[in-house]
């Protein structure tokens, strides 16, 4: 940002920005956070000159970038893909329809689908089966585990069947990893989730936190720099089990599903973190029979 006209004081909160963003060539890695890329894709068309985004590494979480490009096109913005990134003409304006359908969130639906796959049958409505959302992969992954999934119109239902461990490449689906760890705990044998090192830079170090959570509920787990290996089977210890969510909404939701699906009573610290992405999560959980108490 400093090379393109913006000065940021980010040593402490609040973050202070000054200056005006200038068009030009923006070079950044593609394997740190897709949000850096999508933010630029939204902003650069509004600048005066032409800009280019050049990536120095392979893209991860490409689905989120595809969603951004689809939205930009809908609102009249031109972006051209290049060999190393994208070219963005300047001086553009956003023009869109008065009404816009917002498709359902596959990332949040994944928690319920895993719950259904572990112990019952749960359907989620309002999902686009052709969505560019990378987390749509949850349906195929549950099938690979051995669970049953059925699609009818805009609804998908996951139903319990005996599950077996699998290998999962997490490079394009990092947000699914916490709930996939729960699915792995309910599957027979080992599940390896690899290409997951980027999870260490999320709201928490999700690899380390999920390894800790799995251990606390009696699941055998091995944490590596870029992967996590889980052996199915849950043997919770006696006494109170307290989970520190590290204020990470996906950790809270994953462990809440683990509690009700695997039959483990937990105390989850920082459960209010769900307000970031799914404020009604615990209301929906109660509708499905989950018992929760706010401390």
Describe these PLM feature segments.
Residues 1-295:
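Short, structured segments at the rim of ligand-binding sites
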């Amino acid at each position: 940002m400093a090379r393109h006209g913006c000065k940021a004081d980010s040593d402490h909160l609040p973050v202070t920005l000054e200056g005006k963003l200038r068009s030009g060539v923006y070079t950044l890695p593609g394997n740190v956070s897709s949000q850096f890329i999508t933010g630029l894709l939204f902003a650069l068309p509004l600048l005066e000159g032409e800009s280019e985004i050049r990536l120095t590494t392979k893209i991860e979480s490409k689905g989120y970038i595809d969603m951004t490009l689809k939205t930009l096109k809908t609102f009249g913005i031109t972006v051209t893909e290049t060999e190393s990134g994208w070219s963005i003409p300047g001086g553009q304006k956003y023009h869109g329809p008065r009404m816009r359908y917002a498709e359902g969130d596959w990332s949040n639906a994944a928690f319920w689908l895993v719950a259904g796959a572990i112990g019952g049958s749960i359907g989620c409505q309002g999902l686009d089966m052709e969505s560019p959302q990378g987390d749509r992969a949850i349906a195929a992954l549950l099938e690979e585990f051995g669970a049953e999934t059925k699609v009818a119109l805009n609804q998908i239902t996951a139903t319990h069947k005996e599950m077996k461990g699998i290998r999962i490449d997490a490079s394009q689906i990092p947000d699914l990893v916490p709930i996939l760890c729960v699915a792995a705990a309910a599957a027979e044998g080992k599940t390896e989730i690899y290409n997951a090192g980027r999870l260490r830079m999320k709201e928490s170090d999700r690899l380390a936190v999920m390894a800790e959570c799995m251990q606390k509920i009696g699941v055998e787990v091995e944490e590596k720099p870029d992967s996590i290996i889980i052996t199915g089977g849950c043997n919770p210890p006696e006494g109170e089990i307290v989970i520190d969510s590290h204020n990470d909404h996906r950790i809270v939701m994953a462990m809440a599903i683990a509690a009700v699906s695997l039959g483990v009573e937990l105390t989850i610290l920082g459960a209010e973190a769900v307000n970031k992405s799914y404020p009604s999560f615990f209301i929906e959980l109660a509708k499905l029979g989950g018992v929760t108490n706010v401390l």
